[in-house]
Amino acid sequence: MLRFTGARAIRKYSTRYALEHLKEGAPLKGLFSIEGLQKAWFDRVKYLDAKLNDCTNEAQQKPLETLIHENSKSASKKHIVNYASSLYNLKFSMSSLQGCIRTPPEECPRLGPEALLQTPDFNRTISNEPLTTGNERLQAALISSFGSLMEFRTLLINSNLAISGDGFTWLVARRQLDKRAMRNDMPNRDIEYDKLFILNTYNAGTPFNFSTSGVMNELNNQYTNMEKQRAKEAGNLEDSEMTAKQAKTKFIYETQQKGFSGKEVSYIPLLAIDASPKTWLTDYGVFGKREYLERVWDSIEWKIVESRLPQRTKIQAFNTL
């Protein structure tokens, strides 16, 4: 978006990425100070918005998801995908954080290196459970997928701690679409939402990148190359190409036997947690990432997360995987 002043064109921050509960010049209670929120959200979204507008004239007309999908297969438009993905990830993660009743981070002493040696207390009572906010369906799905809420919480936090730079930890729902349901004589698509997963993405990666077709193609290539290499190492150089073809056939057969045949799989994001030091360094310091994540947990608005859980989820399917 451009605003003209005299002969100069000044880029104005687009409010299309604004979140109602985040106010510039105000803190996010219990999670970010005024300065912390400015650096974690406002400065970054303004920068990314300006960069995206510099790359394409469609940034103000199309949703971020559309920009990501339409440009993801073009190497020359990778920069558009990166900026759009980064904006999407940042907005998605902040949209679920409503703050908490903890002491403001700027009023707490900075943690030192001893924080790295702290052992998590697995006997502690979990605060901010989805059940306590009336989100029974989400809590049931979490327990069915991860065993218990404590296991889910531990995996979520530890997964984020494992990211040393920019990235996000996601809670996603796996959606399976039966290709046969796309025939003209079967107008109602058979969509199944069978399980929840936690995954990490790095830099500008998004859950949209995790599709069964892409993963299976990559695994297929790896399997074929491995078999081809084995043939070469065994001295059967002339047979290596034939071995590769046989390996591909074997891979396809085994994949079909394991139930992947006829299924398109995608992942629906429900929750994202930002791991970037830009988010937590200002308020929590070098050794405060775990403290930041503990407060993120207490700040999650589970009603928003549950609203993203597909209504057609087959709860009974959670117990079979």
Curated annotation (Swiss-Prot):
- InterPro entries from the UniProt entry: SOD_C_sf
Say if the entry is tagged with keyword Signal: no
Family statement drawn from the similarity comment of this UniProt entry: Belongs to the mitochondrion-specific ribosomal protein mS43 family.
**Which additional comment does the entry carry?**
Present with 2840 molecules/cell in log phase SD medium.
Gene3D superfamilies annotated for this entry? Answer: Iron/manganese superoxide dismutase, C-terminal domain (3.55.40.20)
List where in the cell it is found.
Mitochondrion
Summarizing the function annotation, the protein's role is:
Component of the mitochondrial ribosome (mitoribosome), a dedicated translation machinery responsible for the synthesis of mitochondrial genome-encoded proteins, including at least some of the essential transmembrane subunits of the mitochondrial respiratory chain. The mitoribosomes are attached to the mitochondrial inner membrane and translation products are cotranslationally integrated into the membrane.
Main location, first listed in the record:
mitochondrion
Known partners and oligomeric status: Component of the mitochondrial small ribosomal subunit (mt-SSU). Mature yeast 74S mitochondrial ribosomes consist of a small (37S) and a large (54S) subunit. The 37S small subunit contains a 15S ribosomal RNA (15S mt-rRNA) and 34 different proteins. The 54S large subunit contains a 21S rRNA (21S mt-rRNA) and 46 different proteins. mS43 forms a heterodimer with mS42, building a large protuberance adjacent to the mRNA channel exit in the mt-SSU body.
Q: Where is the transit peptide?
A: 1-13
**Keywords on record:** Mitochondrion, Ribonucleoprotein, Ribosomal protein, Transit peptide
Q: Which GO terms describe its molecular function?
A: structural constituent of ribosome
Establish whether keyword Protein biosynthesis is in the entry: no
Q: Name one GO cellular component term.
A: mitochondrial small ribosomal subunit
Which example biological process does GO assign this protein? mitochondrial translation
Name assigned to this protein? Small ribosomal subunit protein mS43
